[in-house]
Amino acid sequence: MEFMSKEGYDKLVSELNELIKVELPRVINAVAEARDKGDLSENFEYHAAKREQSRLLGTIRFKQNILAHARVLDHSSL
């Protein structure tokens, strides 16, 4: 369980939305463009884009997991 402030929770939600709505489509597009350039076995751009996609998906899953187990602290009750 992750304890966090409302501000911290909102910031994490905002970061996650940015990753899903902006960064992920950009990376998916980069993978598709690199794939169209031909032979994948020697295509550095494709492999770099796939590594970036994998890293990004891991970050998204990590943040989703934190939010799924987050408990927002109410400062007024402390």
Regions found by a protein language model. Give the residues of each.
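N-terminal cationic and glycine-rich segments that engage phosphates or anionic surfaces
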Residues: 1-17, 21-51, 55-61, 67
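Glycine/charge-rich, flexible interdomain linkers and switch-proximal surface loops
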Residues: 43, 70-78
